[in-house]
Amino acid sequence: MPVRRLPVRPDLEQLHRQAKELLRAIHAGDAIAIAELREHYPDLTDPSAAKLADAQLVLARSYGASSWMRLVHAVRLADAIWRDDADTVRTLITENTALLREHVLIRADSNWGPPMSYAANLGRNDIVRMLFQLGAHDREFAAGRAALQGKTDTLHLIYELGGRPSLDRYTLAGPAYTLSVEGTAALFALGVQVMTPSGVDINTMEHLLGTDSRNPSAKHRILEMYVEHGYEPPDTPVMALHRGRIDLLEAHLEKDPQLFTRTFAKIDVFPLGPSWAEQPYVAQGTPVHGTTLLHIAAYFDEVEIAEWMLDNGMDPDARAAIDDRGFGGYTALFSTVVSQRNFWVNYRMGQPDEARFTRLLLDRGADPNIRASLRAQFEEGHGGGPLREYRDVTPLGWGEQFPEKLFVSRESMRLVESFGGRR
């Protein structure tokens, strides 16, 4: 059965339309709609007798709500917080105080949390203060969400409302994941530490190095803030790339003239995020295990570092390592056609599809028709799924066969084809 999840900003009109569509499907005898009816409203044995109120109840329960009215309250509460309408929030909460403790989006796995945390995500300070006065207890989670979203004023407000509590349970992991420089700086200003008695906070590093966000300059700055607060990063070429430190890469190249021909294992890419390195072919897009610094730069959208490498002798057609089953050998061009950055381009058209990295490689002579075989599997956060194999594909073939098109750049595909690329 469909498992429905309210979006971060739900739309009541859309839910009304969904209920009417569900009712029509039930009356038409649609198998999925009938199965939903039986699962969520087994007492109604005659589908032809279903009314709109019945379809609304089925829909509400499929969203995890106990009733249609509970679903409506959730949407109205979310909408009021988005509009910064404190009066409506107060009315809804006082009419049903249980809402103060329940997730606004109903589902237990919603990381936007109860009303105070939900408001903290949006920097709605007046609403945060009011909900605290009404008895909200999710201060730590709300503070974490404010930091993650870079709402520094809200973070400080929650810290003061809580009576300046111990910082032991505050973490830098949230703003590390979203690459929020402001949130990281605010937590450091409060006294949160990146170093623990046993070394750097591994959870924070896993969130920073393994994030699916793409904002190289922000990641560089956050890593330098960690250094300013006691972190001593490993002196490796990949860490220099993570930090955006071309000066350190220059030093590594001087010591190792073969640097640009070397390939790196996934554990080299995520040295302080061991959980990210456990499965070599699991990736956010094109796998990064066994690849060169140019592939790694493409994986993290480090265009300026790639320009420097190409200016200093990097072969634009440098290949990934080939394993004992013949998988590998792909170039960085594959890594630009299918990438995490493309997800953010395609997801609600969030960023322009400039395909800068693809254009850079092609302008520097990358072969658009190199063939390679790849094995790839999605991270759990992107839905997981089976390990898939792609044999003897070109960059265009890789993009066409990749199952999740949100990770495929249409502009990259167009550019590759314009440079003579074939399937």
Predicted features and spans:
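Short coil/turn connectors between adjacent alpha-helices in alpha-solenoid helical repeat scaffolds
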Residues: 210-217, 341-356, 406-409
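Long, contiguous interaction/recruitment modules in multidomain scaffold/adaptor proteins
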Residues: 52-61, 65-75, 198-218, 222-227
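Conserved ankyrin/ankyrin-like repeat signature
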Residues: 88, 126-127, 153-154, 182-183, ...
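Ankyrin-repeat boundary/"N-cap" motif
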Residues: 73-79, 102-118, 137-148, 165-177, ...
